Swiss-Prot record:
Gene encoding the protein: rplC
Region annotated Disordered, chain positions: 126-163
Top-level taxon of origin: Bacteria
Protein name: Large ribosomal subunit protein uL3
A family per Pfam: Ribosomal_L3
UniProt xrefs under HAMAP family: Ribosomal_uL3_B
Family from the record: Belongs to the universal ribosomal protein uL3 family.
GO cellular component entries: cytosolic large ribosomal subunit
A molecular function GO annotation: rRNA binding
InterPro entries, alphabetized: Ribosomal_uL3, Ribosomal_uL3_bac/org-type, Ribosomal_uL3_CS, Transl_B-barrel_sf
Entry annotated with the keyword Acyltransferase: no
Keywords of the record: Ribonucleoprotein, Ribosomal protein, RNA-binding, rRNA-binding
Signal peptide: none
């Protein structure tokens, strides 16, 4: 049973399927993650499994986190993540979550922080068209009109303008696991995932499997 796992993005490559077609893939080093806490309905009001991933030096972790990990008898970890479960049977405190809990062909959702691009303009951030480059125009990469004058006399909230681009947590849904390498803790996932190489990823079973519903909910 796969509840979820934390991993590190290694980069992108290509994978050849049975027909010899090159498929773009992402290599993810996932786990092994130790189970650091079990939450039950009796003690916490819901059932969940908390896992830890990544090494950290003792001087860089605070006392509350150190005490929390000491209860489970686990080594210090850099990242903690919690997953809701319906049943805690067969899950033990101190156990390991590995890539072997997943299967080739399984659909997963991958969450991570997108690459930060700093302060960006309208063309790069929102894909706006630029202004004329010749004939005396000075409006090359400026936003142009951003609203009316007297009415409403203000800029509506949510207006697309320049600002910070990237560095947000997003989820890419319905990616397919093409291959699993248990010896090297690798997941080969079809397509791209958020973040740059070395960034933290959260991989969990897809909660939307199947064809998209038709418009109107029918």
């Amino acid at each position: 049973m796969s509840i979820g796992i934390l991993g590190k993005k290694l980069g992108m490559s290509q994978f050849f399927d049975e027909q010899g077609k090159a498929v773009p893939v992402t290599l993810i080093e996932a786990g092994p993650c130790r189970i650091t806490q079990l939450k039950s309905s009796e003690t916490d009001g819901y059932q969940a499994v908390q896992i830890g991933f990544g090494e950290i030096r003792e001087k860089l972790i605070n006392k509350p986190a150190k005490g929390h990990l000491a209860k489970s008898g686990e080594d210090l970890v850099r990242h903690l993540c919690e997953y809701r479960v319906d049943d805690l049977d067969g899950i033990q405190l101190g156990g390991a979550v590995t890539v072997g809990d997943f299967a080739a062909g399984q659909k997963v959702d991958v969450s991570g922080d997108t690459m930060g691009r700093g302060f960006a303009g309208l063309q790069k951030r929102h894909g706006f068209s630029r202004g004329p480059m010749t004939h005396g125009s000075k409006n090359h990469r400026q936003p142009g009109s951003i609203g009316a004058g007297t009415t409403p006399g203000r800029i509506y909230p949510g207006k697309r303008m320049s600002g910070r681009y990237g560095g947000k947590k997003i989820t890419t849904r319905g990616l397919t696991i093409l291959k699993i390498d248990s010896e090297r803790n690798l997941l080969v996932v079809k397509g791209s995932v958020p973040g740059k190489p070395g960034s933290l990823l959260n991989i969990r079973p897809a909660n939307r499997v199947g064809a998209k519903p038709a418009k109107g909910g029918k």
